[in-house]
């Protein structure tokens, strides 16, 4: 089982955070201490590193397709000279190219479709030149295709296409070999629409090996991070919407690479019992709605259920669809929000069981002493305390920065920090008598 260390320094409210994730990690802190910011960046790093090679390939594929799409306007313009079947064949080939991935044919299949598209262009261009009488229009089209002389159509198209594909392939292979950290930064900004700059001081280690170096390391044992945000939170951040969209996809769709794991059905039964019902799929025209079906026969769409229910429903569907595995990092932000104290303990028990059953690594941010206490003692009961960590975000005196203190398994400082709120309450009572 791999161990991870994640560090951010001097970024927004975070003064220093150096956390370890081996099983379950709990980060405790007040609102505004930067714990959600840290979770978000960990999510970005894991999900970008784990599919970096696929990103390299998709960029290569997309630029090849774009190089062909630029001819579409010209083909539409000269369509009266063209065979409709040939134009449809060209468009269909471009459509097939968009579906090529690193895992289903890669460069070889893309090269095959590219040559097919170029051959189709060659045929259509020859057709056009045989019929077009306007020399200006002929020269205009030849210039677009990079053809020097009308009688050099085949040679020029072949030479130009080979050169173009070779240049883009060389860039793809260069990126794949060198894995520049600048590419990671650009991808995070683009994919997650992250407006804030990349942290100047950030580190991510797998089994003590630093991965965020000039030549990015490969992540071996994690292939997916899943983020469940605070149920009642409303965010205007575009990056938060991207995270929510990714979660929604997994809640709806089955992980084709998932497998049946012993204990899965027991967990699903436990969650159904907790929510006193089940989640069913109901067809809605060409879409599928997820509906909470209570044991007393009431149906509610999951977007309309109580916010405290939602983390439980999300986890139920993630388990059903095979997304929670030993290669998954589950990040859950303040899951206790809007939950009755008894449910907090039940939820903590569920999270510990997920870790034990699937080997899923879990990062929990919280400011609830019941959640912290429940995770601590249930982990011990389940024999998982040696891989459970607790951190407390403490504000540096006279600053807006928070430093994350490693508590190990000693959660007493957490309760001491919560006692400060009671001290504040006592001052109000002393000053005003009643509230």
For each predicted feature, which ranges?
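Phosphate-coordinating catalytic segments in nucleotide- and nucleic-acid-processing enzymes
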Residues: 5-7, 48-327, 398-435
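Switch/communication elements of ASCE P-loop NTPase nucleotide-binding domains
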Residues: 1-51, 291-426, 430
């Amino acid at each position: 089982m791999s161990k991870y260390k994640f560090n951010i320094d001097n970024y927004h409210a975070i003064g220093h955070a150096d956390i370890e994730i081996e099983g379950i990690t709990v980060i405790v802190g007040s609102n505004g201490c930067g714990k959600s910011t840290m979770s978000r960046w960990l999510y970005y790093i894991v999900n970008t590193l784990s599919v970096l090679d696929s990103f390299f390939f998709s960029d290569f594929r997309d630029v090849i397709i774009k190089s062909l799409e630029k001819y579409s306007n010209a083909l539409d313009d000269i369509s009266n000279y063209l065979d409709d079947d040939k134009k449809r064949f060209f468009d269909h080939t471009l459509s097939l190219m968009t579906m090529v991935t690193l895992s289903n044919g890669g460069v070889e299949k893309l090269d095959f479709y590219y040559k097919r598209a170029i051959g189709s262009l060659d045929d259509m261009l020859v057709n056009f030149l045989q019929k077009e009488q306007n020399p200006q229009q002929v020269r205009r089209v030849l210039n677009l295709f990079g053809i020097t002389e009308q009688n050099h159509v085949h040679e020029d198209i072949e030479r130009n296409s080979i050169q173009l594909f070779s240049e883009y392939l060389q860039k793809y292979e260069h990126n794949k070999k060198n894995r520049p950290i600048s590419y990671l930064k650009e991808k995070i900004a683009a994919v997650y629409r992250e407006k804030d700059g990349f942290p100047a001081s950030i580190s991510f280690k797998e089994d003590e090996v630093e991965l965020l170096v000039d030549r990015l390391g490969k992540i071996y044992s994690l292939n997916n991070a899943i983020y469940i945000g605070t149920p009642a939170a409303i965010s205007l951040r575009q990056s938060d919407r991207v995270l929510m969209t990714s979660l929604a996809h997994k809640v709806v769709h089955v992980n084709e690479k998932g497998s049946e794991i012993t204990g899965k059905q027991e967990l699903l039964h436990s969650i159904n019992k907790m929510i006193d019902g089940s989640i069913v799929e109901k067809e809605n025209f060409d879409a599928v709605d997820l509906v909470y079906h209570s044991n007393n026969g009431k149906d509610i769409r999951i977007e309309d259920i109580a916010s405290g229910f939602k983390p439980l429903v999300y986890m139920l569907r993630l388990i059903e669809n095979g997304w929670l595995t030993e290669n998954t990092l589950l990040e859950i932000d303040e899951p206790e929000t809007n939950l009755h104290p008894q449910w907090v303990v039940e939820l903590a028990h569920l999270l510990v069981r997920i870790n034990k059953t699937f080997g899923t690594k879990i990062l929990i941010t919280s400011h609830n002493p019941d959640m912290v206490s429940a995770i601590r003692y249930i982990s011990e009961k389940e024999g998982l305390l040696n891989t459970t960590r607790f951190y407390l975000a403490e504000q540096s005196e006279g600053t807006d920065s928070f430093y994350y203190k490693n508590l190990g398994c000693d959660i007493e400082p957490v309760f001491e920090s919560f006692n400060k709120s009671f001290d504040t309450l006592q001052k109000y009572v002393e000053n005003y008598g009643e509230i």
